[in-house]
UniProtKB/Swiss-Prot annotation:
Organism phylogeny: Bacteria, Bacillati, Bacillota, Bacilli, Bacillales
Species this chain originates from: Bacillus subtilis (strain 168)
Enzyme class: oxidoreductase
Quaternary structure annotation from Swiss-Prot or TrEMBL: Heterotetramer of two alpha and two beta chains. Directly associated with ODBB in the E1 complex.
Protein name: 2-oxoisovalerate dehydrogenase subunit alpha
Keyword hit for Nuclease: no
Entry binding sites for thiamine diphosphate: 72-74, 123-125, 153-159, 183-187, 252
Amino acid sequence: MSTNRHQALGLTDQEAVDMYRTMLLARKIDERMWLLNRSGKIPFVISCQGQEAAQVGAAFALDREMDYVLPYYRDMGVVLAFGMTAKDLMMSGFAKAADPNSGGRQMPGHFGQKKNRIVTGSSPVTTQVPHAVGIALAGRMEKKDIAAFVTFGEGSSNQGDFHEGANFAAVHKLPVIFMCENNKYAISVPYDKQVACENISDRAIGYGMPGVTVNGNDPLEVYQAVKEARERARRGEGPTLIETISYRLTPHSSDDDDSSYRGREEVEEAKKSDPLLTYQAYLKETGLLSDEIEQTMLDEIMAIVNEATDEAENAPYAAPESALDYVYAK
């Protein structure tokens, strides 16, 4: 990372630091959830570790007052940037009534919050893609200046929903930003056993849209790609397919044993490019972050995480008689 790249992209010094703070908050919430899971307090974790830079860099490039996001299950960085809180995410992890995603009904990672235009996802992967296309179409019909931003893993890009959504969006030049977070594994299946093409973005040409592959460990590179896609969408030029390359630093989920399909040496080598470390180094090079500032930031974040954990652990579960609430609109 070279000096002051963020300024060349139109980001202020404060925005550049805020990106790091959001990445660090996502990581610390995620780490706490693993501890809670291993101590038997929450049943399931599906991690964002290693993908925070792509998620936060993308979110900062969007209009967070207007655009719609349709995140996939690892996108803690996206939803935090769009207004969810540590408390919201902990309520979801503990499946408590105050969980804003589903009132304690869904598994963690099924993000949804109407007030922040975070659209609820489903457990079958890639269902969010055609939904994003539908939102973009509705925005076009209602003459609203919005974009729909949708994410998915590289394994999900092999599903029919991806093809149908990408084709429809391209034909109708809809303002959709497709972002594939390629973390090298679809659960246990390595990338080279999933697809024959070199990059997921190579598929874009078949739909008649631009495709670009960027370093998912660099939030500024992702920011630039998403910003350009957002501007292109606003000009009425249609969708863009962005592929971010990162590495999943944890097992697929808390129920997975990744030692059965990848070695510790591979994971340890990937940790050398941990986006929190590389972006931290950039901020220190540019004089925006010092050890003292970082420690203060970490102390503040851990206080937030601790408070969110305590509140969620002590919060009530949903009443049994409310089990069928929210099935139908009233």
